[in-house]
């Protein structure tokens, strides 16, 4: 008996809106998309949503560095993110932003409900404060020397060198990463979510049996160490939502970020008449809610998020599906090695379905890291998808289209073999449901091996050359096409584009239940190449582009740091005062007021301007290297200061009879000295 479709809401963690999507992000989004597509293939009602996490100090500061508003920056990043996800066929029903009216309304509502119910407290805390930028500094915006190993230039929360964790106040010689100033301690009132009040509820939720064992075990460790109140506020300046009823106080980004799931769904509900927000989020909802996240944010999703929802009168997630990190070639992704690969860079060179297949082949339901070994990636995709699966169609389609006008045989001659393929449906379905995608792929490729073994044994290419074997040729080739059809129905959640091309070739929509019966007397279309092999040269080109991107990014970062360092220096830092001289030496220099009678460019000279100067009854010709800073017509008629007793110097372009005084580091940053109009040509400068 048919059961009612399940109503499911699925989310991915919200990418932060200050950078590009990379292949580490794509693991989660591909994993979730495969699960979502499987559920849809089985007839379930799934809404798949995401958004950009668009608040916080890093976004505010990066926008300042770029000279644009945070709103402009997050809009551009959102456009890039959505383009990348679309490129990988991530089938979101809605992609929104935490910087939205829906999210502001929901964040305020949840906060006020928590406050009304006694779950919000406040107290004064002391924090490091940048006196130049007049802002409190998050841990990652303080740098200094590690208190344990003494490594320099370490962040305020942990040391990259020795792994020690600490408070920013523990750093030796701390400096603001924003301005370079030495931070000071300053008091401020902050607001806290009283997480310990939810300990019994969270323990019960943990013992429900639905969470991954690794997550449940980690939560037990946190319970044993004691739950702490959670600081949910930040002081101005801050890019985010102001806390209702407070001045210059903002929600910490991690309060409104998970509420972004609700905000994105609310936005989707506003676009559609068939969705009811409360049906999915009310406390007694019978719909299903699942979050796909990385292991680095388990703390927020398994403790704070369900507690916030419960305290504000909303339902909790059915489960939080956690995955590990992505490594490349057995190591952490590296920009210098070109293995820190952006999604857009990958799409410039390779088919997204290749990565979807490879990730699926290695994914399981545990919190294991996944290694993207690029050599294995090439070999596995070419071996499995091209040689085993797609080749099954290409080996048989030509006989059907050329010899039988594209028509499959009127009867199916291998029912036992076909039933073996169909019998695997329940096993593969269970593996998809439980996110054991790697095992599902192994089941599918094992079936592909059996299908190819059958074709090898029947050898249709031999039958095609023998007289009187026409019917057998059609029947054998039809079996091959039908077995390929079943395999592609099973692979449809993983490789939707290949499935779509297969549907066009078969002249049929692939459904899970529809392949239970083979196609007989069915007309297919002319076979076209369905899938291309991975060319190792394209993988190499992707790595090279990643290296180039990293080099450009590093150069820009170094330039920005140099400019920041330069801006923090005084003029004396840049150009220290020269050694002392005796007064007589200074008195020997005769400086006079001069009026610029004329000024002109010197042909074939890159830096020089030619001046005629009136120094009070005498005219002097002087050459000065300030062409990069001034146009000649800007200077004519102005007063300036010259060294009048400098020995004349014969130059290529004529005799220079003195020196005009100017200040500045050079280039366009030069300024001639201009005395007040009361000064007259010829007056001595004392």
Curated annotation (Swiss-Prot):
<feature type="binding site">
    <location>
        <position position="146"/>
    </location>
    <ligand>
        <name>Zn(2+)</name>
    </ligand>
</feature>
<dbReference type="InterPro" id="IPR033911">
    <property type="entry name" value="MetRS_core"/>
</dbReference>
<feature type="short sequence motif" description="'KMSKS' region">
    <location>
        <begin position="332"/>
        <end position="336"/>
    </location>
</feature>
<dbReference type="GO" id="GO:0005829">
    <property type="term" value="C:cytosol"/>
</dbReference>
<keyword id="KW-0648">Protein biosynthesis</keyword>
<feature type="binding site">
    <location>
        <position position="335"/>
    </location>
    <ligand>
        <name>ATP</name>
    </ligand>
</feature>
<dbReference type="InterPro" id="IPR004495">
    <property type="entry name" value="Met-tRNA-synth_bsu_C"/>
</dbReference>
<dbReference type="InterPro" id="IPR001412">
    <property type="entry name" value="aa-tRNA-synth_I_CS"/>
</dbReference>
<dbReference type="InterPro" id="IPR012340">
    <property type="entry name" value="NA-bd_OB-fold"/>
</dbReference>
<dbReference type="GO" id="GO:0000049">
    <property type="term" value="F:tRNA binding"/>
</dbReference>
<feature type="binding site">
    <location>
        <position position="159"/>
    </location>
    <ligand>
        <name>Zn(2+)</name>
    </ligand>
</feature>
<keyword id="KW-0820">tRNA-binding</keyword>
<dbReference type="InterPro" id="IPR041872">
    <property type="entry name" value="Anticodon_Met"/>
</dbReference>
<dbReference type="InterPro" id="IPR002547">
    <property type="entry name" value="tRNA-bd_dom"/>
</dbReference>
<comment type="subunit">
    <text>Homodimer.</text>
</comment>
<keyword id="KW-0479">Metal-binding</keyword>
<keyword id="KW-0694">RNA-binding</keyword>
<comment type="similarity">
    <text>Belongs to the class-I aminoacyl-tRNA synthetase family. MetG type 1 subfamily.</text>
</comment>
<dbReference type="GO" id="GO:0006431">
    <property type="term" value="P:methionyl-tRNA aminoacylation"/>
</dbReference>
<dbReference type="GO" id="GO:0004825">
    <property type="term" value="F:methionine-tRNA ligase activity"/>
</dbReference>
<dbReference type="Pfam" id="PF09334">
    <property type="entry name" value="tRNA-synt_1g"/>
</dbReference>
<keyword id="KW-0547">Nucleotide-binding</keyword>
<dbReference type="Pfam" id="PF01588">
    <property type="entry name" value="tRNA_bind"/>
</dbReference>
<comment type="function">
    <text>Is required not only for elongation of protein synthesis but also for the initiation of all mRNA translation through initiator tRNA(fMet) aminoacylation.</text>
</comment>
<keyword id="KW-0067">ATP-binding</keyword>
<dbReference type="GO" id="GO:0046872">
    <property type="term" value="F:metal ion binding"/>
</dbReference>
<dbReference type="InterPro" id="IPR023458">
    <property type="entry name" value="Met-tRNA_ligase_1"/>
</dbReference>
<feature type="domain" description="tRNA-binding">
    <location>
        <begin position="585"/>
        <end position="686"/>
    </location>
</feature>
<keyword id="KW-0963">Cytoplasm</keyword>
<dbReference type="InterPro" id="IPR014758">
    <property type="entry name" value="Met-tRNA_synth"/>
</dbReference>
<protein>
    <recommendedName>
        <fullName>Methionine--tRNA ligase</fullName>
        <ecNumber>6.1.1.10</ecNumber>
    </recommendedName>
</protein>
<keyword id="KW-0030">Aminoacyl-tRNA synthetase</keyword>
<feature type="binding site">
    <location>
        <position position="149"/>
    </location>
    <ligand>
        <name>Zn(2+)</name>
    </ligand>
</feature>
<dbReference type="GO" id="GO:0005524">
    <property type="term" value="F:ATP binding"/>
</dbReference>
<dbReference type="InterPro" id="IPR014729">
    <property type="entry name" value="Rossmann-like_a/b/a_fold"/>
</dbReference>
<keyword id="KW-0862">Zinc</keyword>
<feature type="short sequence motif" description="'HIGH' region">
    <location>
        <begin position="15"/>
        <end position="25"/>
    </location>
</feature>
<dbReference type="InterPro" id="IPR029038">
    <property type="entry name" value="MetRS_Zn"/>
</dbReference>
<dbReference type="InterPro" id="IPR015413">
    <property type="entry name" value="Methionyl/Leucyl_tRNA_Synth"/>
</dbReference>
<dbReference type="Pfam" id="PF19303">
    <property type="entry name" value="Anticodon_3"/>
</dbReference>
<keyword id="KW-0436">Ligase</keyword>
<feature type="binding site">
    <location>
        <position position="162"/>
    </location>
    <ligand>
        <name>Zn(2+)</name>
    </ligand>
</feature>
């Amino acid at each position: 008996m048919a059961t009612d479709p399940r109503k499911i809401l699925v989310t991915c963690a919200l990418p932060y809106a200050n950078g590009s999507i990379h292949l580490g992000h794509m693991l989660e989004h591909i994993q979730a998309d495969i699960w979502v597509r499987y559920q849809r293939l089985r007839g379930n009602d799934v809404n798949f949503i995401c958004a950009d996490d668009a608040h916080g100090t890093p976004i505010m500061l990066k926008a300042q560095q770029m000279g644009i508003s945070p709103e402009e920056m997050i809009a551009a990043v959102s456009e890039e993110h959505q383009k990348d996800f679309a490129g990988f066929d991530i089938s979101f029903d809605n992609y929104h932003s935490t910087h939205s009216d829906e999210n502001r309304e929901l964040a305020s509502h949840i906060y006020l409900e928590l406050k009304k119910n006694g779950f919000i407290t406040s107290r004064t805390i002391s924090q490091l404060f940048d006196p130049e930028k007049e802002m409190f500094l998050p841990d990652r915006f303080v740098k200094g020397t590690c208190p344990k190993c003494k490594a320099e230039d370490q962040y305020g929360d942990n040391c990259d060198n020795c792994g020690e964790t600490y408070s920013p106040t523990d750093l030796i010689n701390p400096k603001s990463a924003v301005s370079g100033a030495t931070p000071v301690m300053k008091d401020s009132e902050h607001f806290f979510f009283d997480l310990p009040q939810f300990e019994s509820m969270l323990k019960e939720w943990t013992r429900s049996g639905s969470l991954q064992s690794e997550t449940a075990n980690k939560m037990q460790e946190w319970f044993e160490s004691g739950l702490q109140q959670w600081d949910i506020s930040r002081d101005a300046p801050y890019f985010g939502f102001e806390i209702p009823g407070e001045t210059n106080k903002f929600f910490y980004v991690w309060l409104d970020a998970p509420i972004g799931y609700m905000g994105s769904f609310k936005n989707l509900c506003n676009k559609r008449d068939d969705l009811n927000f409360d049906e999915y989020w009310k406390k007694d909802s019978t719909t299903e809610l699942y979050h796909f996240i990385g292991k680095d944010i388990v703390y927020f999703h398994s403790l704070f998020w369900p507690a916030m929802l419960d305290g504000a009168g909303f339902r909790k997630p059915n489960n939080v599906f956690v995955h590990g990190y992505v490594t490349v070639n057995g190591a952490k992704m590296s920009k210098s090695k070109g293995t820190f690969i952006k999604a857009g860079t990958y799409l410039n060179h390779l088919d997204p379905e290749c990565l979807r297949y490879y990730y699926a082949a290695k994914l399981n339901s545990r919190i294991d890291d996944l290694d993207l070994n690029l050599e294995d990636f090439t070999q596995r995709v070419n071996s499995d998808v091209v040689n085993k699966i797609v080749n099954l169609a290409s080996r048989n389609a030509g006989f059907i289209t050329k010899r039988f006008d594209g028509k499959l045989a009127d009867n199916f001659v291998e029912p036992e073999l076909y039933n073996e393929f169909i019998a695997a449906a329940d096993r593969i379905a269970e593996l998809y449901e439980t996110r054991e995608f790697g095992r599902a792929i192994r089941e599918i490729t094992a079936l592909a091996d059996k299908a190819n073994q059958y074709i090898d044994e029947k050898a249709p290419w031999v039958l095609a050359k023998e007289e009187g074997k026409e019917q057998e040729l059609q029947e054998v080739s039809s079996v091959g096409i039908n077995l390929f059809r079943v395999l592609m129905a099973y692979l449809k959640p993983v490789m939707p584009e290949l499935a779509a091309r297969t549907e066009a070739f078969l002249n049929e929509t692939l459904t899970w239940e529809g392949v239970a019966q083979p196609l007989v007397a069915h007309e297919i279309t002319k076979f076209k190449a369905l899938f291309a092999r991975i060319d190792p040269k394209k993988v190499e080109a992707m790595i090279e582009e990643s290296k180039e991107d990293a080099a450009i990014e590093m150069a820009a970062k170094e330039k920005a740091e140099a400019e920041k360092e330069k801006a923090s220096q005084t003029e004396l830092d840049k150009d220290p005062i020269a050694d002392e001289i005796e007064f007589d030496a200074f008195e020997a220099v005769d400086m006079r007021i001069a009026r610029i009678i004329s000024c002109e460019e010197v042909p074939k000279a890159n830096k020089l301007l030619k001046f005629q100067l009136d120094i009070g009854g005498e005219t002097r010709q002087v050459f000065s290297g300030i062409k990069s800073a001034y146009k000649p017509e800007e200077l004519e008629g102005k007063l300036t200061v010259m060294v009048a007793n400098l020995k004349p110097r014969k130059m290529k372009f004529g005799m220079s009879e003195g020196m005009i005084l100017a200040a500045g580091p050079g280039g366009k940053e030069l300024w001639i000295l201009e005395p007040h109009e009361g000064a007259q040509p010829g007056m001595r400068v004392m």
